[in-house]
């Protein structure tokens, strides 16, 4: 996702980053995406510093993982920031099991599917991240 100040409506896509200041970790994939879009990169240590630079007006945007951004927004509801663009990237998540634990994996997957079907995962997602990240 691309994050900007809440009041900034000029960035609505990756193309809009061209020539703009984007606060990014130097070696992150998000930084590579910003550079590929033509953004001027302001090197930072991580997401919190990126968002601080945006709030201070020293950067105009940052690209980062939606889950990390939603977590920040949940902890800082009055940050004055918004998700300006969400390209809908899906980053697969997996749970680790020991090899040969097929019965456990089957039970786990069934339980996870039941929680998804009855809406429990959606409720947990909204409670902890303020958005439905189960889709």
Tell where the protein language model's regions lie, with residue ranges.
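Flexible hinge/capping segments at coil-to-helix
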Residues: 4-22
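Short helix-initiation/N-cap motifs at beta->coil->alpha
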Residues: 9, 26-28, 42-56, 90-91
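Residue-level signal for nonpolar/aromatic packing positions in well-ordered secondary structure
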Residues: 2, 17, 54, 95, ...
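Secondary-structure junction motif
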Residues: 12, 22-37, 66
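Beta->alpha turn/N-cap motifs
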Residues: 5, 25-29, 46-47, 63-73, ...
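Ligand-binding clefts/hinges and TM-proximal coupling segments of bilobed small-molecule sensing domains
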Residues: 29-42, 81-84, 107-135
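Periplasmic-binding protein-like
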Residues: 1-4, 66, 70-113, 131-135
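Short helices/loops that flank or line small-molecule/ion binding pockets
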Residues: 15-18, 36-37, 48-68, 75
